[in-house]
């Protein structure tokens, strides 16, 4: 750990944000053969995490892992995701003082309360999880409260694009040797150890092979209780935190071929509950 932010700014975080992310993006775009709207952009600093990792209650929160962050053409996005982190990173590199990163990290921790939140996306996550597992917090539709109190989010690829067009198999192969992705995985593992989530939930089929390889030791099990490919899931456990943590992988909520209807989303969570009751 480093500096005055003992619980927040880990060596893993500093290693990730200290990289030449423009060079990393150029290399990963080439390796994954990304083009058009799927290209990762080289001018936005990497997405590390959002959610208040200092206030999460161990065993009463969920780590959501997405595919890669959405590039939003909006002044709010530019202020929060480009101008703020670049200002903080410049000051940190010039001074060597980790306190220079505090405004950026504090914004990340308060992301779910901010005007810059990708509300369309995160409402779906909150409404998928909240009513069933955090009903006292979620109430009628307190989606922000559910996120703030119970969710931390990271992405398997920390770089932004207009569309997620990442090939699952190519990504898993790249994760075996790419220095930026290995550094990012170390950060994800640090987040898992810190918040000790009730479970880890992967949102998007493009992350299944990589997560199975890197967190499940290649032992993920596919379940299709409903006979509906949209609600098919993969399940398993990870031991990276020193504890045995369940992992749910489902297709992208709201995406092509994913669990898009309320029926399919309930099928996803019903299958998860059934498996979890016998494998917790």
Feature map (PLM): residue ranges:
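Short, contiguous, well-structured surface segments enriched in hydrophobic/aromatic residues
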Residues: 144-166
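C-terminal capping/extension of enzyme domains
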Residues: 1-38, 172-189, 206-280
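Active-site and ligand/interface coordination hotspots across diverse enzymes
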Residues: 1-121, 184-191, 237, 278-280
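Structural motif
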Residues: 64, 201, 247-249
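A contiguous catalytic/ligand-binding core that recognizes phosphate-bearing ligands
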Residues: 130, 134-147
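Surface-exposed cleft-lining segments at the edges of enzyme active sites
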Residues: 101-121, 125, 158-182
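Short, solvent-exposed loop/turn segments at secondary-structure junctions
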Residues: 68-72, 157-161, 205-209, 252-257
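Proline-aspartate-enriched helix->loop->beta-strand connector
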Residues: 188-204
């Amino acid at each position: 750990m480093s500096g005055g932010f003992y619980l927040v700014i880990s060596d893993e975080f500093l290693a990730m944000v200290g990289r030449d992310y423009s060079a990393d993006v150029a290399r990963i775009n080439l390796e994954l053969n990304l083009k058009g709207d799927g290209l990762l952009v080289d001018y936005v600093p990497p997405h590390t995490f959002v959610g208040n990792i200092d206030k999460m209650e161990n065993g009463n929160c969920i780590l959501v892992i997405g595919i890669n962050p959405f590039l939003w053409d909006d002044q709010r996005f530019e202020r929060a995701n480009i101008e703020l982190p670049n200002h903080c990173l410049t000051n940190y590199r010039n001074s060597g003082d980790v306190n220079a990163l505090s405004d950026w990290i504090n914004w990340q921790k308060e992301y779910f309360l901010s005007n810059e939140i990708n509300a369309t996306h995160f409402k779906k996550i909150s409404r998928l999880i909240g009513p069933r597992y955090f009903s006292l917090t979620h109430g009628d539709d307190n989606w922000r409260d559910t996120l703030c109190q119970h969710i931390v989010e990271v992405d398997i690829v920390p770089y932004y694009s207009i569309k997620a067009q990442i090939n699952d198999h190519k990504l898993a192969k790249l994760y075996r040797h790419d220095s930026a992705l290995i550094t990012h995985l170390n950060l994800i593992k640090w987040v898992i150890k810190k918040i000790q989530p009730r479970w880890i939930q992967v949102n998007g089929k493009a992350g299944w092979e990589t997560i199975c390889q890197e967190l499940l030791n290649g032992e993920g099990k596919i379940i299709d209780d409903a006979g509906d490919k949209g609600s098919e899931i993969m399940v398993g456990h990870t031991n990276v935190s020193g504890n045995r943590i369940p992992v749910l992988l489902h297709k992208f909520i709201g995406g092509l071929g994913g669990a898009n209807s309320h029926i399919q989303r309930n099928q996803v969570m019903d299958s998860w509950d059934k498996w979890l009751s016998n494998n917790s």
